[in-house]
Amino acid sequence: MSTGPSFWRGTESGAEIAVAGSVVVKRHRPGTPLIERLALAADHPAFVPPLRSTPLTDADGRPVTLWPRVPVLDPNDAEHPWVEAARLLARLHLSPAPAGLPRHGWAQRLARVRNRAPTELVPLADRLLAQLAARAEPARLVHGDWHLGQLGHWTDGWRLIDIDDVGLGDPAWDLARPAGFWAAGLLPDDDWDAFLDAYRAAGGPAVPRHGDPWPVLDLPARCAVLVAAVHSGGTADALVEACRRMAQ
């Protein structure tokens, strides 16, 4: 695990983060709904709690939140906490959804990616956006942008960080990235099996307890691969090739 150096950086979603000592300051995209999300993170044991349960506003009118600086997952670690992450997500997905939360952020993320995608991937993005819009979803509590980088180590173990896309919807979206990376050949079978088995054992509602999970995961996984293909560096070739196969 690593806490990393102190520096300002932008995120793929348009937010900005500064680390100052033991505090992480996050400037969110204008208009990001934060009041209900902060209240959830302050009370729910699946999240690293904020230092303030209400947002501030900077000189440009952008909402600002304050967080404790916690160790995050080091991608160079030999082992990743797939089992712990699966149990954490199942716990979140089984929790009652508080009133006032918006929908999760996948539709907005896919739309942003569509505007940045290379020409050959735009038709795929349009097709996935149409399928997403037509998808009937339950109103469960979801993180909305989950991957291993969204884990922070708190006093009692791993918890979730980054509330920008927390909302209501199908919990299958929180399994989208590992599912998509596994389908693209970028996540080993053992890791995917450990993650899926632990999620099912914890009662996670995103997939059937037994049988093929892919009818539920197919669209979220395809969306996750497209998003990663547009944003990625070292794995871009494999992800773009996976997108080409999806487009056929």
Predicted features and spans:
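A cross-family kinase active-site recognition segment
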Residues: 73-123, 137-139, 168
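Regulatory N- and C-terminal appendages and interdomain linkers associated
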Residues: 1-5, 34-37, 62, 238-248
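Active-site acidic catalytic loop and adjacent metal/ATP-binding pocket
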Residues: 6-25, 130-173
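A glycine-centered beta->alpha junction motif in the catalytic cores
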Residues: 63-77, 94, 111-115, 222-237
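All-alpha amphipathic helical-bundle segments outside canonical DNA-binding/catalytic cores
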Residues: 206-221
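Active-site activation/catalytic loop segments of kinase-like enzymes and analogous catalytic loops
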Residues: 172-205, 222-237
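Activation segment
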Residues: 30, 72, 158, 166-168, ...
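A conserved alpha-helical element in kinase catalytic cores
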Residues: 24-65, 71-91
